């Protein structure tokens, strides 16, 4: 069980964009949550617990890498919220 964390507003905003990007990729049928969790070694319960409670403490920056490298989500957009999601 992960300890609760108090993330900064900036980190919470990045986390929110991560989940927005995941939803967009899922809607476009580019990924499934199960497959994404397997390929990134995210424990699926941690993915869902973190989504439900942003201060859960499971989130890692590495969760975003395949979105950028494989699914062409803009790293600039993930970090800043500016520009287009797909880059």
Pin down the residues of each PLM region.
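DNA major-groove recognition helix of helix-turn-helix/homeodomain DNA-binding modules
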Residues: 60-77
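Conserved hydrophobic/aromatic packing and binding residues within compact polymer-binding modules
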Residues: 36, 47-50, 78
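Recognition helix of helix-turn-helix/homeodomain-like DNA-binding domains
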Residues: 41-59
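A short, Lys/Arg-rich alpha-helix, primarily the initiator
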Residues: 1-38
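Short, charged recognition helix plus adjacent turn
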Residues: 1-9, 76-87
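Pre-recognition alpha-helix immediately N-terminal to the DNA-recognition helix
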Residues: 17-21, 46, 63-66
